[in-house]
Structure formats: structure tokens, C-alpha cells
Amino acid sequence: MTLAKDIASHLLKIQAVYLKPEEPFTWASGIKSPIYTDNRVTLAYPETRTLIENGFVEAIKEAFPEVEVIAGTATAGIPHGAIIADKMDLPFAYIRSKPKDHGAGNQIEGRVAQGQKMVVVEDLISTGGSVLEAVAAAKREGADVLGVVAIFSYQLPKADKNFADAGVKLVTLSNYSELIHLAQEEGYITPEGLDLLKRFKEDQENWQEG
């Protein structure tokens, strides 16, 4: 079993991912979605957590071998980033969604030197907007951001465009396509549900029609 499939299996088993193609969720953006993901749940399961963190370490070594500091996004990327940094014996920092409104007004907490080569850790990629804002903040404060790693991606076309436009490399451990096919294989969804989930990936606005 590949790492992507193994992680997808864990996410389904521990109910970090819910699939309801016939009764969709409503995202904060207002989009009706057949999938809801809460990767914070992974922290409660040592076997899953270890699989993910070891996967991150190997992915970072392969894609970003020159990394000098790990940074987590607040809040979901912080625990994963801290564990990764510990495993790799690297410094750790975290990036706030906005600068503090008191004290020094920091947006990055920790010590990041000018030009230090950074990898940013996120738990989930939907459109990529929030993590790319974190990357921009890190660059403003002098970090040399090599790229982003995440547990899971919805593989939305908008995310592909956003990362391409920003010139930021993205590496994810698992993804939507891997998960939905495994979910059908393992009986979490029907073949009809799989068709709806495939349609959502292609067209988030009109996937329920037809």
C-alpha cells in the first residue's frame, strides 16, 4: 500500500474525513461539499500521527533537502510542525494568521534568521489561500520559503492555480482522488456516491446538477 493510500485509509477509519455526497456539508465559503475534513483528529491516534509525521519527514527530505527551519501555520500546522522539527532536529517557528496587535506585533513566533530556508506545514489544502498568506508573511519577515507540505489536499483547480501563481511548491501526503476511490473500495460510499464525489472535484459549483 502506498503512503497516500495508507493515510487515506487512516483518515477514513478514525473519522477525520466524513463523506456525505447525498447530504452535503456547507463550507464557511458557502460551497456545498460532499466532504468534510478535520485533520486535528489525527493527533488523538498515535499510530496515525506517527504515520503522518514520518511521512512528512521523508517528503521534506526528498523535496526540500536544504531545509533549515520548519514553520507551522496557526493553529492546525503547529503540532505537526513541532513534531517534524523535533524528528529532524531543526528549529521550529509558527506563523500567525495576522500580526499580534500588542507587544512587538510579530506574525512569526520563534527565531527565523534572514534568508533561512523554511518549509511551511499545513494540515489541509482546499484553495490554499490561508497557507499562501502565511508563506507571504514569512517571506516579508525574511525567510526563504522553499515550499509547503500538507497532510491532505482536496485537489481543487483553484488551489493548483493559486500555488502556481504564487510560485510555491506544494507536497501533500494524501489527496482527494486517492481517498474517494479507497472509500468506495472499502464500502464507505456507493458507486453513485463516488460519481458525485468525482463531479465535485471538477466543478464545485454545479456538481449536484445533472
Curated annotation (Swiss-Prot):
| Record keywords | Glycosyltransferase, Magnesium, Pyrimidine biosynthesis, Transferase
**Enzyme Commission designation:** 2.4.2.10
User: Which residues are listed for 5-phospho-alpha-D-ribose 1-diphosphate binding in this entry?
Assistant: R96, K100, H102, E122, D123, L124, I125, S126, T127, G128, G129, S130
Q: In which pathway does it act?
A: Pyrimidine metabolism; UMP biosynthesis via de novo pathway; UMP from orotate: step 1/2
What does this protein need as cofactor? Answer: Mg(2+)
Keyword Transferase in annotation? yes
The organism's superkingdom is given as: Bacteria
Q: Which Pfam families does the entry mention?
A: Pribosyltran (PF00156)
A molecular function GO annotation: orotate phosphoribosyltransferase activity
| Residues that coordinate or bind orotate | S126
Tell me, what is an example of a GO biological process annotation in this record?
Answer: pyrimidine nucleobase biosynthetic process
Instruction: Please list the reactions this protein catalyses.
Output: orotidine 5'-phosphate + diphosphate = orotate + 5-phospho-alpha-D-ribose 1-diphosphate
Q: Which NCBIfam families match?
A: pyrE (TIGR00336)
Reported function: Catalyzes the transfer of a ribosyl phosphate group from 5-phosphoribose 1-diphosphate to orotate, leading to the formation of orotidine monophosphate (OMP).
**Description of how the protein assembles with itself and partners:** Homodimer.
- Name the family the entry cites: Belongs to the purine/pyrimidine phosphoribosyltransferase family. PyrE subfamily.
Q: Which HAMAP family match?
A: PyrE
This chain's protein is named Orotate phosphoribosyltransferase
Gene for this chain: pyrE
